[in-house]
Amino acid sequence: MMRTDEEMLYDDELSDDLLTSTESEEGDGELYEHFRVEVDKGQVPVRIDKFLFERMQHSSRNRIQKAADAGFIHVNGAPVKSNYQVRPEDTITLMLDRPKHDNTIEAEDIPLDIVYEDNALMVVNKPAGLVVHPGAGNFHGTLINAIAWHLKDLPSFDPNDPEVGLVHRIDKDTSGLLVIAKTPDAKTILGKQFFNKTTHRSYNALVWGNLTADEGRIEGNIARDPKDRLRMTVFPPDSEIGKPAVTHYRVLERFGYTTLIECILETGRTHQIRAHMKHIGHPLFGDERYGGTEILRGQRSSSYKAFIRNCLTLCNRQALHARTLGFVHPVTGQQMDFTSDLPQDLASLITKWREFINGHTGIDNQ
C-alpha cells in the first residue's frame, strides 16, 4: 500500500525543513514530494526502483533512481540504493524533487541580505514579511524572485528548475537564515543533510508567560487543525494522528510576563515552534494565528494594555527569528556556521520589555 502524505489524515507534511509552510501566503507548492509505502506480506523480491516505478504515477524510473543515489529512499529507516530487493512488510519512505513549475518565476530587483556566497550556495538573512517562494496568489515579490535577479547572469541557475534553489523554508513572518543551492549537486547534498537531520539550526523567540523551568523538551505529534487548515495542532506522542515532533527550549531572559527563549528543533514540522509553544500555554508574542496577540499575562490596567498594544505595533508579527544555521559545505566538506542578529523590530521589542520590567518590581510568575 502506498500513501502520499497529502492522502494521510491530518498528516500533510513530512518536514517543515523541506516543505512549504501552511501559511496561505506561502502557496501550496512543496519543495519535495514525500511518499510512504507499506509493502504487502505476499510481495516477491524485486528491485526497489522497479517496484516504485510501477506504483507511482507521473514518476520516471530515472527520477526514482536519482532519489536513491541521493540517499532519499529509506527502507525501515535506513538508506538504500536503487538495486535494493524489496521484501515483504518493508516500510519505504522517499523524497522526490517536484517537476518544474507551471508558472515561470521571473527575476525581480528585490534587495537581498546576503550573509555568504560562493559558487555552490548562498546564505541569506530573510526579513519578516517576505514570502519565500511563489505560490497561489503570490507569484511576485518573493525571495526566489529576488534570488533569480541576483543570479540572472549565472547560466547554470534556473529558478524554475527544482534541482536548484531552496533547500528549506521559514514562514513569511519569521525572519532569519536560509541556505540556497546554486547547483543540482549542492542541493542534493544539502537536502540530504536536512533529510538526515545533521544540520544545526536554532531560533530565538519571545513567548507569553514565565516558563517554570530554565530549559525543557516538548514532545507531541503535529498535524493540521481539522477546523482550520492554516493552523497546526498537537496530538499525544503515541497518537496515530500527525507526525512526531520534538522541540527543545532554553530560557535566555525573563521579563515576568514574557520570556525570551532559544529553540532547537529535533524534528522540523510545519509551525513546530509556534504550535508546540501554544500547546504548553506559552504562544509566541504577536502570533495572531496561535493566540499570541491577546493580553495573556500581566496586569489589566489601562497603562499595561497600552504598553502591550505598543509592543504589538512595534513588532507586528510572531516574535520568531532563525538565528543560527550550520551545515557541511557540499563541495569542500567544511563545517559552515552562521549567526544572524535579531532584526530591528525584535531587538526593539526586547528592549521595551527590559525597560518595562526594570521599572516594575514584585512581578509574579505567570
Predicted regions mapped to residue ranges:
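RNA pseudouridine synthases
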Residues: M1-Q366
